[in-house]
Amino acid sequence: MRVTQGCFSFLPDLSDEQIKLQVGYAMSKGWAVSVEWTDDPHPRNSYWELWGLPLFDVKDPAAVMYELAECRKVNPEGYIKINAFDASIGTESCVMSFIVQRPINEPGFYLERNEVQGRNIQYTISSYAVQARPSGDRY
């Protein structure tokens, strides 16, 4: 099951040249760019591991591409995304985020139903990858 989070998630994976163009666009807007990775892509897991520090004053997309390449070396089967942060007054938020790498095999999620007080049903989404292996050894 293909994880769909962020911009471009329903499109085919971006090439490195397309990623570089998107990073260049973010930098042309004055946005700070960062690289993050995880092995738990649960939809509510919004806090991925930050790779290095955000690249605040970097003006060349090649620097981001270098950091992305280093992150890919260390996390060859993890999820990696690029974020762009707009620090301008009134926004101060992540304005663009997209996955740039994913594992070859994405096992997907399962729905767990639990009956609670008053015959109410609670639903939980869990990842098959998280269920099968500990953190750091999932892909």
UniProtKB/Swiss-Prot annotation:
Subcellular location(s) per record: Plastid, Chloroplast
GO annotation, biological process: reductive pentose-phosphate cycle
Leader peptide range in chain numbering: none
Family membership noted in the UniProt record: Belongs to the RuBisCO small chain family.
Role according to the record: RuBisCO catalyzes two reactions: the carboxylation of D-ribulose 1,5-bisphosphate, the primary event in carbon dioxide fixation, as well as the oxidative fragmentation of the pentose substrate in the photorespiration process. Both reactions occur simultaneously and in competition at the same active site. Although the small subunit is not catalytic it is essential for maximal activity.
Assembly mode: Heterohexadecamer of 8 large and 8 small subunits.
Protein name per Swiss-Prot or TrEMBL: Ribulose bisphosphate carboxylase small subunit
Organism: Pylaiella littoralis
